[in-house]
C-alpha cells in the first residue's frame, strides 16, 4: 500500500508473552513470580552456516544442564516417590513406620510454607555442607559456622506488622457516626458512605473485624434504607446499598448480621416500584450476594416475583442477578413453600421460554430442578408444569448449545415429572417428541455429519446415556415381574392408558432401536441396566404388529447378552454380580417375549442359537459357588419396593465455613440439592443363581426345544461347507473363485431372510471359507476382484452378518485399576506402598541398614528408573550425614575429603535390578503396571492391591556399566518421550472363536470395500471404556487385546477412537496426563487434588528465527529439538507475534519448502496431471501428489536421504504438538511405509496387478503404459516397436539392470522389465528414502504406532483433507461477539462472502486468520479457540470503510469493521488476506 494509506492496513495482531491467547490449549505452562512462562527461549541469528547459532536469551535463559533437568522433571517421573518409611531390618510386625518426606526434585531443597521436620533440616544441612566443602579451602571458618545461621534463619519467624494507627480508627468511627445521622444531614451521610466503601475495599477481613463495628454500620444502613424521611434520597440509598455490598464481599460474616437486621424485606421493598434504575440494579446485586448464603431467608420473605417483575427493563447484568436470586432461593425449597412457588412461576415461565442468554438459562434450570426436587411429593405438583414449560425443557435437552450439566438436570426434571404424575407421563409420551430429543442430544457428539448412531454413541458421555435411559424407563408403566427394578407402583391405572395408539406405536418402534444401540455401544453397567428395564417395560406394552417390526433387533441383542457368560467370572474366579445381573435381565426379556409373542419370535430365536445359550446358562447358574452366605432376598438400596425421589445434600452447596481461622469463601452460585432417583434392585449372588435357574427352566419349557428340527437351509449350508473343505474343489483361477463366491452368496442370502451370525459360525461356514482364502495360491488381486464382482450388491448385508457374529463371539475383558471409587482421572495421583528389600549383603555392598528394608509410598505411575534414583539419592545422603559426625569434631585432610568424594561419586553411579514376584522387572515399567499385571496374571483380587504392602527386592546390578553408558548416550541425544508400550508393539492375542470372523473382515477391507459397517460398535465401546481408565493406560497396563486389535484390525474402530488411542499410548507421559486433565477440566475432584495438579506439566520451548532462512533454520531445530518432549513454539525476529499463530505459519511454510523441486526429493513429471486440489502452482514447487523419486545409484544421494529423515521428524513433530501441515502426499507413500513397518509383510506387493494399481495412483500415464506392455507381453513385434530400454521411464540415467541402457524390451524379457520398473518405482529405488523417513519419524515416537491409522487418513491429517465451507457449517461454528450477534446483517454478508471463496482465497483467508492455510481435521468445528468475529471500531475520525479487518491468530479472532456495503467488505477482506500475510505485527 502507499505510505499515506498505511494506517488503514492492520497486520496480524499479536500478544504479549503472558497473554492467555498465545497458549496452546493442549498443554499447561508454568509461570515464574513475574508471570513469565518458564521454559527455553532460543534465538536464531541470520547466519545460515553458523554451527553455534543456537543460544539462549532473555528471561527464558537456561543452560544445557538446566535443560536436561527440565526435561527430566517434566516428561519423566522423577519425584513421584512421596513417602519414606524406615523399619528395623527383618522386623515385619508391630513396627513403627516413620514417614519421611521425599522432595520432588533433588535440586530443589528450599523449604516452603510446610512445617519443618528434623529430617528435612538435616538433609538441607547436609547438602549445604556438601556445597560449602568445595569452596572452603583456605578459609578459617568451619562449614558448620556458615551453614547453621542459614538453617536458623529458615526456622525463624517474621516480625508481625504494627497495628493500624489510632487516627485511622478515629476517622472510621466518625464516618460511621455520620451515617447514623443521615436524617439530619443526608449529604454528609452519603459522602461518609462513599469513603467507607472505598476504605472497606482496601481492607481484608481481619482489618474489618478489628476496626469496623459491623452491627452499628449495618444497623445505620438499614435505617437509611427504611427511613420514610429519606425515601427521596435515592443517591444516598444507592451509596448505602453499595457500602453494604462491599462489606459483604470483604467480610462475609456480616451477611448474617444484615439478615438479622431484616435487610432482606427492606431491600425487597425498594423493588416494588422502580424510580431509579441504578438503585434497583445495586439492590439486585446486593440481594443476589445475600442469596448465595441465605437463600432460605429470601424464600421465607416470599414474593419472589418482585425480583423479576420488571425483568424486561433491566440490563443483562441486572437480569442475571434477578434470576440468580430466584434460583439461589429455590435451592432451599421445602414442601411448605408451595404457595411461594405458585406465586412466582407465572412470571418465570415466559422468561424461561424466551431466554437465550446461557447464564440466565442455567439459573432457571437450577430453579426448576430445585422446585422438582423439593415439591414432587406435593398433591398439586403437576399443576406447576404446563405443557409449554415441559416442551421448553425437552427443547433444552435437544439443542446443541445447552451445557451437559444443564441437559442432565433437564432430564432429571422430566424424569421426576413422569414419575410423579400419570397425566404428565402420558403427555410426555404423546405430546412431545422424545425420540427427536434423544437423537439430537446425541448428535452434538458426532464426529462427522454422516456418522451413524452407533458411531456417535461411542462418544456420548455415560452420564447423558444414564439420564436418557432412566427417563425412558419411567415413561412406561412397570413390567409385571420386577426383577431389575425396585419400584412399587402407587399411581392409578391411567399411566398404562394409551389414548393415541398410533402415536404410541410410532414412539415404541423408534425407541427400541435407540435402546438396543445404547446397550451395544455402552460398557457402563448402570446404562445397560436402565436399557434392560426400559426394554422390559416397552415390550410389555407393545402389540403384535409393533413386535414384528422390532423382532430381529431384540433377538440379536438377547443373543449378544446371553453369549457373554464367559465374562461373568472375575479374574480371581468368583462370579461377577454385575454380569450376572445383566444375564438375568436378558433372560427376563427373553421370558417376556416367549410369553407374549412365542410364535412370532420363535424362528428368530432358533436362528440365533438362543436355545443353546440358554441351556449352557442353566449349567453356569447351577455352578455358582456362594462362598459367602448370601441373602437370597433382594437387597434394596431404599425402602422395599418404593420408587421415589429423595433429596441429598449437594457438596458444592452446603460447605461449612470456619469463620474464626479462614476467610469465608462465598460460592459464585448455589446449586440445588441433588435429586437422587432410586430404581435399581441390588441383586445378591444367591438371588441371581435362583432366579437365573428359574428363568432358564421357564424359557425352555415354553418353547419345547425338543421339537426343533434341522431345517432345509441348514442342510444347504452343510453342503456348501463340504464343497469348501473338499481339496478337489478348483480354486486356481478367477473363474474358479467366482464359482466359490457364487455358491457362498446363494447359501447366505435368501428372499425372506439372511443367514444369522450364529448360523454362519456354528455350521462351520466361517471357518471353511477362511481356510480356503488363507490357503489359496492365487493372487490377492484375483481373490478381491472375483469377490467384488459377485458380492457387489450385498456387501453391506454380508458385513452385517459378520459384525453380528463378532459381537456375539468376542469376549475381550475390560480391566480396571481396582479402586473402590472407580478410579477416574484422580487415580493418576494415587500412591501405592511398596517394601524395598535388599537381596544381598547390605553391609558388604555399602547399602546401609536403613535401606535394606524400606517402605516407600510411591506414585503408581513412577517407573523403576525413578525408584533406582531414589535409592541412590538416599544412599548418598546417608553416607554424607554419617561422614559429618567425625568431621565436626576433627579437621579432615585433603586426602580424606578426596576419598569421601570418590566414594560418593561411586554411589551416585550405582544401579540396581528389581524383582517382583521373583521376576526381574523392566526399568522403564511403572510400579503399578508391574504389580497390576502380576495380579491379573495370577487371578488375584485387584481390590486387595491397594490394601497390601508389596515387597519388591532389589540387588546390585550386574549391568551397571552398560546402563551407565546407555544413560550417557541418551543424555547426549537429549531427553525423549517416555514410551511405556515399546516392548508390546505386536503382542499376539488368542482371539478364540472370533478369529475366523476377524480374518474375513480383514479380507473384505483389503479388497478396498468402503463402508462404515466395518466399525464394530461393541468393540469400539469397550476400547473407549478401557481408555477411560487413566491409571491403567498411564501405567502401561492396557490389555493385550487393545494393542493387538488396534494394530491388526484398526478398521473395527472409528477414527477418533484410534486417534485417542494413539495419543494415549505414543505421545509421552506428560501429554497423556495433560490430555486427561483437559478432559476433566472443571471437575471438583481434579480441582481439589493438588498432587494431580503437579502431574504432566509440559515445558514450552520458544525458538526465535529469521524468516530469511526459515527452512535451513527449521532443519536445525528438527535436528536439535525434534525428539524433545517439550512443546516447540516459533517466533520471528523483529516481529511481536507469539504463540500459536506464528508457530502454525512456520509449519505451513516449512511444509511448502519441502515440496520444492530443487530438493530432488519427489517425482516431477513434465506430463504430470494436476490434482483437483488448488495449490500454489509456481514452477518452483511440485504440483502433483508427493511421492519419492527413485535414487540414481551413481549419484551422491546423502542430502536427499537426510532430507527424508528431517521430513519424518517434522511430520511426527506436527502430530505430537497438534500442528497443522500443508502437504499433499500420495496415499501410496504411506501404504509403502506401513508395509515396511509391518512384520512379515513385504514392502512391495507380490502380484503385478496390485503394484500397477499403486503406480496408477502415483503416475497414471506410466501405469497406463505398463498395463499396455503387460497386455501385449506375447506380441514381440509390438514390444520391439516401443523401442524401450531397461531404464526407468522418464529417467534414462537409472538402469533397471547393469547395462540396461543397451538392452531392449522384447517378449522374452518383458516380465523382467515390468518387475524392474515396479522395483524402482515402489521398491529398491525409494527404499532408502522410506527407511530414512521412518527413522526420522521414530526419533519422536515409533512409526509402528501409526499402523492404527490408514494411509487415506494420514494423507488427510497432513493436509489433503476436503474442507466444508458451506454457509450452514459456518453459521454453526462461528461466534459473533462484542458488537455483533449472529443476526447482524454484517455477519450474514461476511458468511456469504467467505462461503463463496475459491480454493486459493480460502487458503489465503485461513493463513491470515490462523497462521495455517489449512483447517484441522474436522474443519471449522475443530478450530480451538472457536472462530469468532467481533466489531472493529473506527477511530481518529476515520470511517469503517477506511479500515481493513485485523486478526488475533492465537485466538482465531477476526476484528471486522461495520462496512457500509457487501462489496466494500469483500474488497477489504481480499485486500487484507493478500497484503496482511507474511508478518505478525502489532496493529
Swiss-Prot record:
Cross-link (Glycyl lysine isopeptide (Lys-Gly) (interchain with G-Cter in ubiquitin)) at residue(s): 349
Domain of life, source organism: Eukaryota
UniProt keyword terms in alphabetical order: Isopeptide bond, Phosphoprotein, Transferase, Ubl conjugation, Ubl conjugation pathway
Location of the active site: 1450 (glycyl thioester intermediate)
Biological-process GO terms, alphabetical: free ubiquitin chain polymerization; proteasome-mediated ubiquitin-dependent protein catabolic process; protein K29-linked ubiquitination; protein polyubiquitination; ubiquitin-dependent protein catabolic process
Keyword presence, DNA damage: no
GO molecular function, a single term: proteasome regulatory particle binding
Extra remark: A cysteine residue is required for ubiquitin-thioester formation. Present with 7380 molecules/cell in log phase SD medium.
Protein name: Ubiquitin fusion degradation protein 4
Organism field: Saccharomyces cerevisiae (strain ATCC 204508 / S288c) (Baker's yeast)
Underlying gene: UFD4
Amino acid at each position: 500500500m502507499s505510505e499515506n494509506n498505511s494506517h488503514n492496513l492492520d497486520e496480524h495482531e499479536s500478544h504479549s508473552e503472558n497473554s492467555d491467547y498465545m497458549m496452546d490449549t493442549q498443554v499447561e505452562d508454568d509461570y515464574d513470580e513475574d508471570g513469565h512462562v518458564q521454559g527455553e527461549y532460543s534465538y536464531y541469528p541470520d547466519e545460515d552456516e553458523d554451527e553455534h547459532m543456537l543460544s539462549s536469551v532473555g528471561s527464558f535463559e537456561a543452560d544445557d544442564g538446566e535443560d536436561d533437568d527440565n526435561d527430566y522433571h517434566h516428561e519423566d517421573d522423577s519425584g513421584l516417590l512421596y513417602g519414606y518409611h524406615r523399619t528395623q531390618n527383618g522386623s515385619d510386625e508391630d513396627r513403627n513406620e516413620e514417614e519421611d518426606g521425599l522432595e520432588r526434585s533433588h535440586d530443589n531443597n528450599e523449604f516452603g510454607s510446610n512445617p519443618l521436620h528434623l529430617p528435612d533440616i538435616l538433609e538441607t544441612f547436609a547438602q549445604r555442607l556438601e556445597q560449602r566443602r568445595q569452596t572452603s579451602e583456605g578459609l578459617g571458618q568451619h562449614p558448620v559456622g556458615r551453614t547453621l545461621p542459614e538453617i536458623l534463619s529458615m526456622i525463624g519467624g517474621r516480625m508481625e506488622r504494627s497495628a493500624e494507627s489510632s487516627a485511622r480508627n478515629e476517622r472510621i468511627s466518625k464516618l460511621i457516626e455520620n451515617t447514623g445521622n443521615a436524617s439530619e444531614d443526608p449529604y454528609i451521610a452519603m459522602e461518609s458512605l462513599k469513603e467507607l466503601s472505598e476504605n472497606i475495599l482496601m481492607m481484608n477481613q481481619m482489618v474489618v473485624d478489628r476496626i469496623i463495628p459491623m452491627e452499628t454500620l449495618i444497623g445505620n444502613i438499614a435505617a437509611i434504607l427504611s427511613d420514610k424521611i429519606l425515601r427521596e434520597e435515592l443517591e444516598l440509598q444507592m451509596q448505602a446499598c453499595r457500602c453494604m455490598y462491599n462489606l459483604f464481599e470483604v467480610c462475609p460474616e456480616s451477611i448474617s448480621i444484615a439478615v438479622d437486621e431484616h435487610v432482606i424485606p427492606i431491600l425487597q421493598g425498594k423493588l416494588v416500584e422502580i424510580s431509579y434504575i441504578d438503585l434497583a440494579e445495586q439492590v439486585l446485586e446486593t440481594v443476589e450476594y445475600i442469596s448465595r448464603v441465605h437463600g432460605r431467608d429470601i424464600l421465607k420473605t416470599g414474593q419472589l416475583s418482585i425480583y423479576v417483575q420488571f425483568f424486561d427493563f433491566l440490563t443483562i447484568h441486572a437480569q442475571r442477578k434477578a434470576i440468580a436470586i430466584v434460583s439461589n432461593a429455590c435451592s432451599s425449597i421445602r414442601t411448605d413453600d408451595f404457595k411461594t412457588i405458585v406465586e412466582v412461576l407465572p412470571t418465570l415461565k415466559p422468561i424461561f421460554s424466551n431466554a437465550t442468554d446461557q447464564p440466565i438459562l442455567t439459573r432457571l434450570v437450577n430453579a426448576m430442578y430445585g422446585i422438582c426436587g423439593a415439591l414432587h411429593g406435593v398433591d398439586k405438583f403437576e399443576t406447576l408444569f404446563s405443557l409449554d414449560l415441559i416442551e421448553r425443557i425437552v427443547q433444552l435437552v435437544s439443542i446443541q448449545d445447552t451445557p451437559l450439566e444443564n441437559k442432565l438436570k433437564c432430564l432429571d426434571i422430566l424424569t421426576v415429572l413422569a414419575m410423579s404424575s400419570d397425566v404428565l407421563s402420558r403427555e410426555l409420551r404423546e405430546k412431545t417428541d422424545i425420540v427427536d430429543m434423544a437423537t439430537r442430544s446425541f448428535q452434538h457428539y458426532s464426529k462427522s455429519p454422516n456418522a451413524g448412531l452407533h458411531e456417535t454413541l461411542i462418544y456420548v458421555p455415560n452420564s447423558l446415556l444414564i439420564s436418557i435411559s432412566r427417563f425412558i424407563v419411567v415413561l412406561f408403566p412397570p413390567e409385571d415381574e420386577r426383577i431389575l427394578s425396585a419400584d412399587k407402583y402407587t399411581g392409578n391405572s391411567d399411566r398404562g392408558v394409551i389414548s393415541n395408539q398410533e402415536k404410541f406405536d410410532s414412539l415404541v418402534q423408534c425407541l427400541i432401536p435407540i435402546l438396543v444401540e445404547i446397550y451395544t455401544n455402552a460398557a457402563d453397567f448402570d446404562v445397560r441396566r436402565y436399557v434392560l428395564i426400559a426394554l422390559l417395560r416397552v415390550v410389555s406394552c407393545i402389540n403384535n404388529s409393533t413386535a414384528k417390526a422390532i423382532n430381529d433387533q431384540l433377538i440379536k441383542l438377547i443373543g449378544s447378552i446371553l453369549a457373554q457368560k464367559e465374562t461373568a467370572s472375575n479374574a480371581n474366579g468368583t462370579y461377577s454380580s454385575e454380569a450376572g445381573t445383566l444375564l438375568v435381565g436378558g433372560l427376563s426379556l427373553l421370558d417376556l417375549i416367549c410369553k407374549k409373542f412365542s410364535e412370532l419370535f420363535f424362528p428368530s430365536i432358533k436362528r440365533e442359537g438362543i436355545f443353546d445359550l440358554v441351556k449352557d446358562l442353566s449349567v453356569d447358574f447351577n455352578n455358582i459357588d456362594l462362598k459367602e452366605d448370601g441373602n437370597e432376598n433382594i437387597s434394596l438400596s431404599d425402602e422395599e419396593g418404593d420408587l421415589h425421589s429423595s433429596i441429598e445434600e449437594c457438596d458444592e452447596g452446603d460447605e461449612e465455613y470456619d469463620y474464626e481461622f479462614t476467610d469465608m469463601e462465598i460460592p459464585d452460585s448455589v446449586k440445588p440439592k441433588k435429586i437422587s432417583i432410586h430404581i435399581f434392585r441390588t441383586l445378591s449372588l444367591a438371588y441371581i443363581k435362583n432366579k437365573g435357574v428359574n428363568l432358564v427352566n421357564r424359557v425352555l419349557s415354553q418353547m419345547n426345544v425338543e421339537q426343533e428340527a434341522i431345517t432345509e437351509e441348514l442342510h444347504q449350508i452343510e453342503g456348501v461347507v463340504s464343497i469348501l473343505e473338499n481339496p478337489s474343489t478348483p480354486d486356481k483361477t478367477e473363474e474358479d473363485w467366482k464359482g466359490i463366491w457364487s455358491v457362498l452368496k446363494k447359501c447366505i442370502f435368501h428372499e425372506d431372510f439372511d443367514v444369522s451370525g450364529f448360523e454362519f459360525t456354528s455350521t462351520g461356514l466361517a471357518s471353511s471359507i477362511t481356510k480356503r482364502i488363507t490357503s489359496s495360491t492365487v493372487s490377492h488381486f484375483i481373490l478381491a476382484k472375483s469377490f467384488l464382482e459377485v458380492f457387489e450388491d450385498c456387501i453391506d448385508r454380508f458385513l452385517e452378518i459378520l459384525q453380528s457374529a463378532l459381537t456375539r463371539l468376542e469376549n475381550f475383558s475390560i480391566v480396571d485399576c481396582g479402586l473402590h471409587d472407580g478410579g477416574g482421572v484422580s487415580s493418576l495421583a494415587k500412591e501405592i506402598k511398596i517394601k524395598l528389600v535388599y537381596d544381598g549383603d547390605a553391609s558388604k555392598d555399602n547399602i546401609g541398614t536403613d535401606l535394606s528394608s524400606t517402605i516407600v509410598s510411591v506414585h503408581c505411575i513412577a517407573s523403576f528408573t525413578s525408584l533406582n534414583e531414589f535409592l541412590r539419592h538416599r544412599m548418598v545422603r546417608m553416607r554424607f550425614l554419617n561422614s559429618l559426625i567425625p568431621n565436626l569434631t576433627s579437621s579432615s585432610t585433603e586426602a580424606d575429603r578426596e576419598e569421601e568424594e570418590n566414594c560418593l561419586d561411586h554411589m551416585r553411579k550405582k544401579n540396581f535390578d528389581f524383582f517382583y514376584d521373583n521376576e526381574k522387572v523392566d526399568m522403564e515399567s511403572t510400579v503399578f503396571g508391574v504389580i497390576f499385571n502380576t495380579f491379573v496374571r495370577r487371578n488375584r483380587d485387584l481390590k486387595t492391591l491397594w490394601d497390601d504392602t508389596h515387597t519388591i527386592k532389589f540387588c546390585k546390578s550386574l549391568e551397571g556399566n552398560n546402563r551407565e553408558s546407555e544413560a550417557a548416550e541418551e543424555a547426549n541425544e537429549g531427553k525423549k518421550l517416555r514410551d511405556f508400550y515399546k516392548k508390546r508393539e505386536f503382542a499376539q492375542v488368542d482371539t478364540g472363536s472370533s478369529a475366523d470372523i476377524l480374518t474375513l473382515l480383514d479380507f473384505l477391507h483389503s479388497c478396498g470395500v468402503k463402508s462404515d459397517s466395518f466399525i464394530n460398535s461393541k468393540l469400539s465401546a469397550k476400547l473407549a471404556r478401557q481408555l477411560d481408565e487413566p491409571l491403567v493406560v498411564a501405567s502401561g497396563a492396557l490389555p493385550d487385546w487393545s494393542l493387538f486389535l488396534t494394530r491388526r484390525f484398526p478398521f473395527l474402530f472409528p477414527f477418533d477412537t484410534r486417534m485417542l488411542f494413539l495419543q494415549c499410548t505414543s505421545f509421552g507421559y506428560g501429554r497423556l496426563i495433560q490430555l486427561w486433565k483437559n478432559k476433566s477440566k472443571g471437575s471438583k475432584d481434579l480441582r481439589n487434588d493438588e498432587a494431580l495438579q503437579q502431574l504432566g506439566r509440559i515445558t514450552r520451548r520458544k525458538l526465535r528465527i529469521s524468516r530469511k532462512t526459515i527452512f535451513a533454520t527449521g532443519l536445525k531445530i528438527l535436528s536439535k529439538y525434534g525428539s524433545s518432549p517439550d512443546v516447540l513454539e516459533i517466533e520471528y525476529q523483529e516481529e511481536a507475534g507469539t504463540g500459536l499463530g506464528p508457530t502454525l505459519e512456520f509449519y505451513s511454510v516449512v511444509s511448502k519448502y519441502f515440496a520444492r523441486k530443487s530438493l530432488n526429493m519427489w517425482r516431477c513429471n513434465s506430463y504430470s496431471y494436476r490434482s483437483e486440489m488448488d495449490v500454489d502452482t509456481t514452477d518452483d514447487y511440485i504440483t502433483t501428489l508427493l511421492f519419492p523419486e527413485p535414487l540414481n545409484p551413481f549419484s551422491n544421494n546423502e542430502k536427499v536421504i537426510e532430507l527424508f529423515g528431517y521430513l519424518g521428524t517434522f511430520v511426527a513433530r506436527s502430530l505430537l504438538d497438534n500442528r497443522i501441515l500443508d502437504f499433499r502426499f500420495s496415499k501410496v507413500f504411506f501404504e509403502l511405509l506401513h508395509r515396511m513397518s509391518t512384520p512379515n509383510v513385504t514392502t512391495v506387493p507380490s502380484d503385478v496387478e496390485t503394484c500397477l494399481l499403486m503406480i496408477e495412483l502415483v503416475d497414471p500415464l506410466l501405469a497406463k503404459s505398463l498395463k499396455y506392455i503387460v497386455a501385449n507381453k506375447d506380441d514381440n513385434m509390438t514390444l520391439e516397436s516401443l523401442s524401450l530400454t531397461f531404464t526407468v521411464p522418464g529417467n534414462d540415467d537409472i538402469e533397471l539392470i547393469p547395462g540396461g541402457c543397451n538392452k531392449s524390451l522384447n517378449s522374452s524379457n518383458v516380465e523382467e522389465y515390468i518387475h524392474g520398473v515396479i522395483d524402482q518405482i515402489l521398491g529398491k529405488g525409494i527404499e532408502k528414502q522410506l527407511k530414512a523417513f521412518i527413522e526420522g519419524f521414530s526419533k519422536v515416537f515409533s512409526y509402528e504406532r501409526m499402523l492404527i491409522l490408514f494411509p487415506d487418513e494420514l494423507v488427510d491429517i497432513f493436509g489433503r483433507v476436503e474442507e466444508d465451507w458451506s454457509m450452514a457449517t459456518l453459521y454453526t461454528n462461528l461466534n459473533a461477539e462484542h458488537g455483533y450477534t449472529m443476526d447482524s446483517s454484517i455477519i450474514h454478508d461476511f458468511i456469504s462472502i467467505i462461503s463463496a471463496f475459491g480454493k486459493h482465497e480460502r487458503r489465503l483467508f485461513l493463513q491470515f486468520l490462523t497462521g495455517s492455510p489449512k483447517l484441522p481435521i474436522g474443519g471449522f468445528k475443530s478450530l480451538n479457540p472457536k472462530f469468532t468475529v467481533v466489531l472493529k471500531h473506527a477511530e481518529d475520525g476515520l470511517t469503517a470503510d477506511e479500515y481493513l479487518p485485523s486478526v488475533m491468530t492465537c485466538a482465531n479472532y477476526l476484528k471486522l469493521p461495520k462496512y457500509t456495503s457487501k462489496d466494500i467488505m469483500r474488497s477489504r477482506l481480499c485486500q487484507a488476506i493478500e497484503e496482511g500475510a507474511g508478518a505478525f505485527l502489532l496493529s
